[in-house]
Amino acid sequence: MEEDEFSKAYDPKGLEDKLYAFWEGSGMFTAQSASDKPPYAIIMPPPNVTGILHMGHALVNTLQDVLIRYKRMSGFEVCWVPGTDHAGIATQTVVERHLYASLGKRRIDFSREEFIKHVWEWKEKSEGVILSQLRQLGCSCDWSRLRFTMEPLANRAVKKAFKALFDKGHIYRGYYLVNWDPVLQTALADDEVEYEEKDGWLYYIRYKVVDSSEEIIVATTRPETLLGDTAIAISPDDERYSHLLGAKVHLPFVDREIPIIGDMSVDPLFGTGAVKITPAHDRDDYRTGINHNLPMVNILAPTGEINENGGIFAGLSKEKAREDIITALEAMGLFVKKEPYKLRVGVSYRSGAVIEPYLSKQWFVSVESFRDSLREFVANDSIKIFPPEFTRNYLSWVNNLRDWCISRQLWWGHRIPVWYHKSDEDRILCYDGEGIPEEVAQDPDSWYQDPDVLDTWFSSGLWPLTCLGWPDVESGDLEKFYPTAVLITGHDILFFWVTRMVLLCSAMVEEKPFSDVFLHGLIFGKSYKRYNDLGEWTYISGEEKHAYDMGKALPKDVVAKWEKLSKSKGNVIDPLEMIGKYGADAVRMTLCSCANRGEQIDLDYRLFEEYKNFANKIWNGARFIFGHISNLTSKDLVYGIDKDLLGLEDFYILDGFNQLLKQLESAYQSYAFDKITTMAYEFFRNDFCSTYIEIIKPTLYGKQGNEEDRLTKQKLLAVLLVNILGVLHPITPFVTETLFLKLKATLGDVDAPCADTITAHALDMLRAESYVVAPYPQAIDIAIPKDLHESFALAERLVYTIRNIRGEMQLDPRASLEVFVICPEGISIETYVPMMCALGGIASLEYLSEEPKDRVYSLGVVEGIRLGVFVPMEHITKERNRLEKEKMRLENSIESVSRLLSSESFRAKANPDLVRSKEETLKNNRMELQSILDKLASFS
């Protein structure tokens, strides 16, 4: 292929879709469970079917695909199972909003079956978009194994797991204080609650002691829950109140008398040392209520309003009830005061609503019997967590784990497989078969199924099993690919998801779900804001923001900050938009280069441009090589390479490539994606293109060596290109595959065996239909000279000296140089000359025994080797004139500053810093002048 058959710039548009269709249509992504190859499986963290992919999805799936492509090329039977998540709360909320916006109807306007039908329609549409986006990113998933967390297989798995845990007593139903979302009207697990610090008040309220003139004052942050108080608690050791133990106080508004109790949990230093106990609406109070056998009075409706137990305040919002209760207490003389107080408020991670501790009957997984195994899997390295510092987080969380609330008051999700007898709710049936239990079928009017659904994380916790066919095992996938190799996910769902997979999967099959866990950081984008005319912060978007993202200097009124991606902050980066603008390879390299081992990934917009340029560098580097190997065929490579014709630069690049493979193997093992990207990037750009190719260009163009030398370089270029593109392929699959197919077409079919240690593996790679199924590059078996690195380092210093002289003399960077060399006795630089000439821009080099006296030159010395660069006469005249002008300027400056510093008046009146500055200027000017005088003398 001639060089001009290539476009001058890499344009991924059109190429990417065609390549992906070729890969998928050829079945290259499909795993074979009957294969003899060692298994390597990853299950995709399923994106929610709520919309489109965001940059976090692009990151996690790029990292997985890099591993999958690397392992597939490394000879493993790779199985990457894609899938999507039904995402109970999130999807139901999105669909409810959609139906209200499009039809003006709320969920309660539909039957359960009608609403679920709408959700399935949403799922089909959204899932199709998501899967298309994954293909655009280049994800080499096994699409024949696509899963969904609400498909029939997943439902069978969920029911089987629920019943297995229920039968063993690990799942129970009971009243408990749950995290209640009054907007979504469902319970949430502890780790679905986010906490914020807010400004609030501490209210002081009088309680009148029954049959006494005494009173007791308590401090509370929530006066509205007074309606549900069932005791006042004090420390038994608090002498101020000990005489009141056993007495009762009158509870206003609801006409109840409640006891004063002693409890060691009360802090005598908080408030007045006396606290109100509301067991149905506070976790600490709940435990106190259990310990003292107190009644539990729920005063809230599921909507968050005051219920019938609130008496005259029933039907009010809790905020309005608080306001009215304080007003009424003031009128009764029972309100004392309020003080500012910092509150730690729980909010729903989905709706943003303030969470209410709420007494409710729910289903729970008892975690106590699993705590030891959860701990041991990680403590004994059966499951390794990367980065390892998150191991401590995991173990701490397991040690403090509480029972997991798994029931949700939703319509969308896996229905809890339990039926209740209408006349006796304690008579229940747990059933994991198809349809309904036989007993229910025989008497359907006497039974009803639990209306609640399971927490999304319950079905997601079984994901590694269901992805591989469990509870059906006929396919052989479970036996072949379980446990999976690694789970890649964000560190923010270590507890939401990772721990629950370990719990549920090990409980079902007595084996861990994966061997490694890699937790990536969360993506942050740069936001910019300024004060508006009202004195409020406003975020900057559009073209102005993009200009700042690309490096435009910030005005003084603009503040930049790395923040979590948010539409309101204007710092969201759409991965599909970036793919359209920069290409999938550039997006993938950007994400891999940022996948550090910290908690935060600062996604710099300029990286997309940088890696787009690198994809173009790959293209143009290959374009140059193709222009010089068009005469080669695969037979030339089969004949091999004569190692006696290899030069210093050849050994150096081959050894460098072998070292690169070792470093990459280590980086892959530790999931150091940023290092993988950087090492491959720097080797291709610096070692291969900027150094090796530049050194051999004179040979390729016939200016150095003979035809045999040229053919050797051409063969080695082809071998290196196949191998280096193979290294880059897992990260940049599209541009490398395009070039691989062109290379196959150029060299022709490989139809003969090859024993040459340099070319053999490259030919094996070229036999493959695609890089996707080609063997990964291997270290090239060649004896490396012992003094290679010392010799190359000396050659680099010689080149550096030549370049330094060029710069000091201000010679044209493109001008060819005439150079002489004087070597100490017994030292030869013959081996280095090709490299020196190519990288130093040397047109002629002669060996002398002493420095010439008839020409002007500039001299450098490296380890006793003298290098002289002759200065052209036309440059001498031009440079002498420039130096004379600079000499005059410096002499005038020296005279002026010297006169100023010699003035006693100046020194007496001037700021000492100014005097020191002038002295420094004088010193520097004198040094510069001496340098110029030396250069002028060298022209004499």
From Swiss-Prot:
A motif ('HIGH' region) lies at residues 47-57. Belongs to the class-I aminoacyl-tRNA synthetase family. ValS type 1 subfamily. Its EC number is 6.1.1.9. InterPro entries: aa-tRNA-synth_I_CS, aa-tRNA-synth_Ia, Anticodon_Ia_Val, M/V/L/I-tRNA-synth_anticd-bd, Rossmann-like_a/b/a_fold, tRNA-bd_arm, tRNAsynth_Ia_anticodon-bd, Val-tRNA_synth_C_sf. NCBIfam families: PRK05729.1, valS. Gene3D superfamilies: HUPs, Isoleucyl-tRNA Synthetase, Domain 1, Valyl-tRNA synthetase, C-terminal domain, Valyl/Leucyl/Isoleucyl-tRNA synthetase, editing domain. A motif ('KMSKS' region) lies at residues 564-568. It comes from Chlamydia caviae (strain ATCC VR-813 / DSM 19441 / 03DC25 / GPIC). The lineage of its organism: Bacteria, Pseudomonadati, Chlamydiota, Chlamydiia, Chlamydiales. Catalyzes the attachment of valine to tRNA(Val). As ValRS can inadvertently accommodate and process structurally similar amino acids such as threonine, to avoid such errors, it has a 'posttransfer' editing activity that hydrolyzes mischarged Thr-tRNA(Val) in a tRNA-dependent manner. It is an enzyme of class 6 (ligase). CDD domains: Anticodon_Ia_Val, ValRS_core. Monomer. It is found in: Cytoplasm. GO terms for cellular component: cytosol. GO terms for biological process: valyl-tRNA aminoacylation. ATP binds at residue 567. ValRS has two distinct active sites: one for aminoacylation and one for editing. The misactivated threonine is translocated from the active site to the editing site. The C-terminal coiled-coil domain is crucial for aminoacylation activity. Keywords: Aminoacyl-tRNA synthetase, ATP-binding, Coiled coil, Cytoplasm, Ligase, Nucleotide-binding, Protein biosynthesis. GO terms for molecular function: aminoacyl-tRNA deacylase activity; ATP binding; valine-tRNA ligase activity. It catalyses: tRNA(Val) + L-valine + ATP = L-valyl-tRNA(Val) + AMP + diphosphate. This is Valine--tRNA ligase. Residues 872-938 form a coiled coil.
